[in-house]
Amino acid sequence: MSKTAVPPRVGVVMGSDSDWPKICAVGAALDEFGVPWEARVMSAHRTPDAVREYARGAADRGLKVLIAAAGGAAHLAAAVAAHTTLPVVGIPVPTPDLGGLDSLLSTVQMPGDVPVASVAVGMGGPRNAGLFAVQILATSDPALEQQLRAFKRQLQDQVAGSNQALNEALRGAGSGGTAQQ
């Protein structure tokens, strides 16, 4: 969790503490942008009352975005979304039996009128969940928006550098191929 005295703006909930190593990139992404956050373990199936109370009280505590990670019968994001008006991002956690397909389908197959934004299963998903929360917050935070713009420029520069390095490698290998700009 962010080590600041500032109240958290993002809440991260997971179905089990064993999910944390698989989703810790969400916290790293939030920390990268200086967004304070909190994390909790709660289960849609084992502690439904705790999930309901957490989701219902989140906005009153100053949270602006909720991120819910679960594997298997991954109903945590849905349970959270049912009890809040805040944006909810679901992270489908990979599972040993089906590689996370079960988690993905449970997270994305929401009924109408109960929206949950979902990210990918695997390594990119948790980071994207954190970045998506940052983008949501940036809609009302000009300083955070500027950080995001700088981040996007940095990504563009990295790709341009990779393209240039590829062109140089192709020329050095005597290849007739080129990597287009």
Predicted regions and their residues:
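Short glycine/serine/threonine-rich phosphate/pyrophosphate-binding segments
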Residues: 19-23, 48-51, 70-79, 98-101, ...
